């Protein structure tokens, strides 16, 4: 291996895509078991590598040189082999600092809560100190001096939170350590996790109306700084934004919500051609599981059982990337569905006026005009609440598709 990333589990990593977007080398992902780290590091069979969980501190004894920022932090994420001598750096510092600065949240003299005690927590504390925070509280499940327990965190006046733990990371997307709504003076938060793009922690912050971001921007920024070191070249910071926007657009799911007969399925098929993303219809996936029509299933088993299966389908689809997901009309009735869809998705409400919607027997909950109107009135505010983009579909469907493409660009 010449260039690459080492870690224990790398199935979720975007690093190969990012490095190969920017640099002219092949970037490999190499999973290394803890028992094999010693032989790998002693062999020095690489040119330049990045290091991730759980080896950011474990590699320190193998290094011949450690940069000043890495010494201050106490861990590295970047190693360069120069004629058999190993040089260690910490580019996570620059990535996290740029992400927080991008939020325009003034942390000077503020109280910050850091979740976790691993290598990234050391980076976070170094960044926060340099941003002039007043006090850093560090939460852990361990009982040690200088740490506070998760049961005690709500007793402190916290203004900002940084999650450095893997809690909420794919495939355990639903996991969450804390309830941000319990902090009354919270200005913002950062979760270093980038898969999913928005963890439930981030979504909770967004719902509260505070600045809240996942770790994708940090990941790209630290990669740019690593590439500068790898190749001894200058790369403008504008490149970070360029790659971020491109990768976000590539990885993000497009999720269509709206009433039955609003045009979601037709629009999804056309978007598939334009966006080069695979289409999944949640109703079709449900019927694949129940082995009958949704109409028959609801008549025999009731709506609640149908909604439970639908939620399971939504959870599984939401964990994937680069999809177009056409949802059933009632998907917005459960907040958990919408939080799952928002983790990796951009929600587009296909807003078709009630008078243009068509009741059909294949949709048991909206099979006549009376029920259709009733459901429309029950759901319209929820569609608008969860939508990132609202697009009218009241004339030519081609115009609707063009409007979606325009809004995505």
What residue ranges belong to the model's regions?
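A glycine- and Lys/Arg-enriched "phosphate-lid" helix/loop adjacent to the NTP-binding pocket
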Residues: 344-382
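Phosphate/diphosphate ligand-binding glycine-rich loop within oxidoreductases
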Residues: 2-103, 196-198, 204, 208-211, ...
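Adenosine-phosphate binding glycine-rich loop
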Residues: 192-252, 393
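NTP-dependent small-molecule kinase module
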Residues: 241-249, 270, 274, 346, ...
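ATP-dependent small-molecule kinase phosphotransfer cores
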Residues: 284-339
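NAD(P)-binding Rossmann-fold cofactor-contacting core
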Residues: 131-147, 285-290
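Rossmann-like adenosine-cofactor binding region
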Residues: 146-212, 331-337
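Glycine-rich adenosine-cofactor-binding loop
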Residues: 7, 90-93, 100, 109-129, ...
């Amino acid at each position: 291996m010449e260039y690459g990333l080492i870690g224990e589990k790398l199935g979720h990593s975007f690093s190969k895509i990012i490095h190969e977007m920017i640099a002219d080398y092949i970037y490999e992902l190499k999973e290394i078991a803890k028992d094999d780290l010693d032989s790998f590091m002693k062999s020095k069979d690489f040119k330049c590598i990045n290091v991730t969980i759980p080896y950011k501190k474990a590699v320190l004894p193998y290094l011949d040189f450690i940069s000043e920022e890495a010494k201050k932090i106490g861990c590295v994420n970047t190693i360069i082999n120069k004629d058999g001598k190993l040089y260690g750096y910490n580019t996570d510092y620059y990535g996290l600092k740029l992400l927080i600065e991008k939020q325009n949240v003034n942390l000077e003299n503020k109280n910050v809560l850091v979740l976790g005690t691993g290598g990234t927590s050391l980076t976070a504390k170094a960044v926060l100190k340099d941003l002039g925070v007043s006090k850093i509280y560090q939460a852990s499940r361990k009982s040690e001096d200088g740490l506070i327990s998760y049961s005690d965190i709500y007793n402190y006046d916290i203004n900002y939170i940084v999650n450095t733990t893997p809690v909420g990371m794919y495939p355990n997307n639903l996991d969450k350590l804390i309830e941000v709504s319990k902090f009354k003076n919270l200005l913002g938060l950062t979760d270093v996790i980038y898969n999913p793009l928005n963890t439930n922690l981030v979504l909770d912050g967004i719902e509260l109306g505070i600045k809240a971001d996942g770790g994708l921007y940090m990941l790209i920024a630290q990669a740019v700084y690593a590439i500068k070191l790898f190749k001894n070249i200058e790369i403008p910071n504008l490149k970070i934004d360029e790659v971020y926007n491109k990768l976000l657009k590539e990885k993000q799911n497009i999720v269509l919500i709206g009433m039955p007969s609003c045009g979601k399925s037709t629009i999804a098929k056309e978007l598939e051609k334009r966006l080069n993303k695979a289409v999944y219809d949640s109703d079709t996936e449900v019927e694949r599981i129940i082995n009958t029509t949704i109409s028959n299933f609801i008549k025999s088993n009731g709506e609640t059982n149908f909604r439970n299966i639908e939620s399971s389908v939504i959870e599984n689809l939401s964990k994937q990337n680069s999809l177009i997901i056409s949802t059933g009309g009632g998907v917005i009735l459960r907040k958990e569905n919408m939080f799952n869809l928002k983790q990796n998705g951009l929600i587009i409400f296909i807003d078709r006026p009630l008078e243009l919607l068509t009741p059909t027997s294949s949709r048991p909950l909206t099979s006549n005009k009376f029920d259709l109107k009733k459901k429309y009135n029950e759901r319209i505010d929820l569609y608008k609440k969860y939508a990132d983009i609202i697009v009218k579909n009241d004339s030519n469907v081609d115009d609707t598709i063009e409007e979606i493409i325009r809004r995505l660009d």
